[in-house]
A protein has these predicted regions:
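Positively charged n-region of N-terminal signal peptides that target proteins for export
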Residues: 1-7, 12
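C-terminal motif of bacterial Sec signal peptides marking the signal peptidase cleavage site
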Residues: 16-20
Length: 366
């Protein structure tokens, strides 16, 4: 009997000791300045940092094998050749992400920012869409809907900060003169037609000879626009439309297809968007160097070309109508740097023991 009782006591003691060793997920991992970091936001920052590392993986590295990949080395700067172990890179980027989140929220509050009900609804709606699409991955990494909603609000606050800092009545407003100069020298308003370099029925791609033939026909249409004497933007766009409607049937016929009923499109592009859209060699510079009222035809990607006309943006919209877009193009990089510096200056009260309960080795990357 004594032996059985002793065994029972030992078993109970073991259960108690094991219960005392259960590792629970912390609610927070500490703070940066006065900004408390939830465990969910920490896991999101860490997962995003891992994805950045995965994007830098070489062809012979498998980011899906998390434990192995964390021990490997990646090139983090192709220009300088700087390298880092993945685990160190993920740790650094996780902290940088958290600092940016904290800086965004703190600066937003300092400047009296307030999300509108519409913005909050937008954040919640997009967060739900992300969970619908990627919920299994998020949940596997400890990231729930509430965290994604929080993150979407941070993104909206970051966007609103552009107005709170640089807009009319902002902390350091940009003058109309500076906005106009940036608009005229760094942004491009286009009226354009996109022409696919494939048969729209069979999806057979054009060969080099067919591309050259299609581009020649489109350039002839651009020349017709440039030879017309049109003063106003509306007259210039009308000339583009007329030239396009005359040329498109022959252009599409090269591939045995017919044009759709697409009307002329218009868009104001910033410099970075121009470069990321016009990826074929020289195409971005061709568009950037157009004078107001001048047209050109370029192959802008591997699958499409464009018949485009540059228009004076202030002839179709007022500066007030374009203010937010110009500020975004002009000041996004500056704001990003300012938030990074602000975040790095915050006192670090992150709890190492809490973060150790959320190790990067537990990341699921399928």
């Amino acid at each position: 009997m004594k032996q059985k009782l002793l065994a029972l006591v030992c078993a109970l003691a073991l259960v108690v000791s094991l219960a005392g060793c259960v590792i629970s997920t912390p609610d927070t991992v500490g703070s940066l300045g006065d900004y408390e970091i939830s465990s969910g936001l920490y896991l999101l920052a860490q997962y995003d940092a891992y994805q950045k590392a995965a994007d830098l993986a070489s062809s012979d590295q498998d980011a899906a094998n998390v434990n192995a990949f964390l021990k490997q080395t990646i090139t983090v700067d192709s220009d300088s050749g700087e390298t880092a172990t993945v685990s160190d890179y993920v740790a650094r980027k996780t902290l940088e992400n958290l600092q940016t989140y904290a800086a965004t929220e703190l600066r937003f509050d300092e400047l009296g920012g307030q999300l509108t009900a519409e913005e909050e609804q937008q954040a919640d709606s997009y967060a739900q869409q992300l969970m619908d699409q990627y919920g299994d991955t998020y949940k596997a990494n400890g990231i729930g809907l509430e965290t994604v909603q929080h993150f979407e609000r941070i993104l909206l606050k970051s966007n609103d900060l552009l107005t709170l800092v640089y807009g009319n009545g902002g902390e350091t407003p940009v003058s109309d003169a500076d906005l106009t100069e940036h608009l005229e020298n760094n942004m491009v308003e286009l009226a354009y037609y996109v022409i696919p370099l494939y048969n729209t029925s069979t999806y057979a791609f054009a060969d080099d000879d067919q591309k050259a033939q299609m581009l020649t026909l489109a350039q002839q249409a651009a020349t017709a626009v440039n030879l017309a004497s049109n003063e106003s933007a509306s007259e210039q766009v009308s000339a583009l439309n007329a030239a396009a409607q005359a040329a498109l049937p022959d252009i599409y016929a090269v591939l045995g297809s017919t044009p759709s009923d697409t009307n002329v499109q218009t868009e104001l592009l910033g410099s970075s968007t121009l470069d990321s859209t016009f990826t074929q060699s020289g195409s971005a510079d061709t568009i950037r160097n157009l004078a107001y009222g001048q047209a050109a035809a370029v192959q802008y990607s591997s699958y499409a070309m464009m018949l485009a006309l540059r228009v004076d943006p202030l002839s179709v919209s007022s500066l007030d109508d374009l203010r937010d877009q110009v500020i975004t193009d002009m000041k996004t990089s500056e704001l990003k740097t300012a938030l990074s510096d602000y975040g790095a200056s915050l006192e670090n009260h992150l709890d190492t023991s809490a973060m150790n309960k959320l190790p990067m080795t537990k990341i699921v990357n399928k």
